[in-house]
Swiss-Prot record:
Keyword Cytoplasm in annotation: yes
GO cellular component: cytosol
GO terms, biological process: L-proline biosynthetic process
Highest taxon of source: Bacteria
Binding site residues for ATP: 19, 178-179, 220-226
Protein's name according to its UniProt entry: Glutamate 5-kinase
Protein's organism: Vibrio vulnificus (strain YJ016)
Length: 379
């Protein structure tokens, strides 16, 4: 047993989500690297043996489908990707099933779309299912349901999906294993002076600019999506590590007290369950632009958002839908559940709360978003 294995074994039992990207599972080739996959399964099995709960978020369905069909020439269209995903998902899960069986472990497949997370009841059902699997000693293997997901209902990438899965199962740690050692000060593939960032306490615009937007050609996630996932997870109280996913003992190395990667510390005050859903579940239906005074009240004082502070309403949304709250420059300030529709909010924007009933003929309270229904993003 390595030193890192011993340190993980000595730690308190934790729930750990391990996200494995396409580049990790293929090694940059066009086929699944089953020799490396068995090494990853071995480490997950060892974690489970040590008393930890493990959830795997696995990419690779499209790569597996392309391999199984003999690398056909297909048009670059959504239907082609869904075809490959439909064929490849069964191949991928069979591979994981056979590899985990070597260690006496059963797995359970969960295929999710954003629609499963946007509705609060379906969100809770997904949470109950994943927890039931874990409680019964079964390792959930989760992927986005690419065979049926359209752009409207896709989470978009397995980095963000893994953060949502972490919230579903109440994870302590999220490992984002990739083809890079972590987050660098610049792209290490282009800049030889790029330095690895060991620890992150706050995710700001500087970090987002560093992360950029591009990734590998085989997958859909680059470093930018990993940063988004880390931001979601850490706000839910989950520690996140971005680390290299190739080589021996990569999972134990990432979980060690001094991980070989970039560690994102969780926020000191983790969000309550309802606010975790607001942050992670629904896609925002519209934007509410607020003035600087309202920004200060929401961010620094934790106040509800009042109509007086609203300057502009963008998009269409109904009462009860999740919206984005931004400042005049377009920076995201918060996400929350709107107490009024976009039409009503446009009418009362900039008005005093006491005037709402005279303007609309009714009111749903003095707040356009109550603080209990709002997650502040700006730090």
């Amino acid at each position: 047993m390595t030193t890192n294995q011993q340190s993980v074994a000595a730690s308190q039992p934790k729930t750990i989500v391990v996200k494995l990207g396409t580049s990790v599972l293929t090694g940059g080739t066009l086929a699944l690297d089953r020799a490396h996959m068995v090494e990853l399964a071995r480490q997950c099995a060892e974690l489970k043996k040590q008393g930890h709960s493990v959830v795997v978020v696995s990419s690779g369905a499209i790569a597996a489908g392309r391999e199984h069909l003999g690398y056909p020439a297909l048009p670059n269209a959504m239907a082609s990707k869904q075809l490959l995903a439909a064929v490849g998902q069964s191949q991928l899960i069979q591979t994981w099933e056979s590899l985990f069986a070597l260690y006496g472990i059963k797995i359970g497949q969960m295929l999710l779309t954003r629609a499963d997370l946007e509705d609060r009841e379906r969100f809770l059902n997904a949470r109950d299912t994943i927890n039931a699997l874990v409680d019964n000693g079964i390792i959930p293997v989760v992927n986005e349901n690419d065979a049926v997901a359209t752009s409207e209902i896709k989470v978009g990438d397995n980095d963000n999906l893994s953060a949502l899965v972490g919230i579903l199962c109440g994870a302590d740690k999220l490992l984002l294993l990739t083809d890079q050692k972590g987050l660098y000060t610049a792209d290490p593939r282009k800049d030889p002076n790029a330095e690895l960032i060991k620890e992150v306490k706050v995710i700001d615009d500087t970090l987002r600019k560093i992360a950029g937007g591009s990734g590998t050609t085989l997958g859909t996630g680059g470093m930018a999506t990993k940063l988004q996932a880390a931001d979601i997870a850490r706000r839910a109280g989950i520690e996140v590590i971005i680390a290299a996913g190739r080589g021996q003992n990569v999972i134990f190395d990432a979980l060690s007290p001094a991980p070989q990667g970039t560690r994102f510390l969780p926020c000191e005050e983790a969000l309550e369950n309802r606010k975790r859903w607001i942050l992670a579940g629904p896609a925002a239906s519209g934007d509410i632009v607020i003035d600087q005074g309202a920004v200060k009240a929401v961010v620094e004082k934790g106040s509800s958002l009042l109509a007086k502070g609203v300057t502009k309403v963008l998009g269409e949304f109904s009462r009860g839908e999740v919206v984005r709250v931004t400042d005049a420059q377009g920076h995201l300030v918060a996400r929350g559940i709107a107490s009024y529709s976009n039409q009503d909010m446009a009418k009362i924007a900039g008005k005093h709360s006491k005037d709402i009933i005279s303007i609309l003929g009714y009111d749903y309270g003095s707040e356009v978003i109550h603080r209990d229904d709002m997650v502040v993003i700006q730090e």
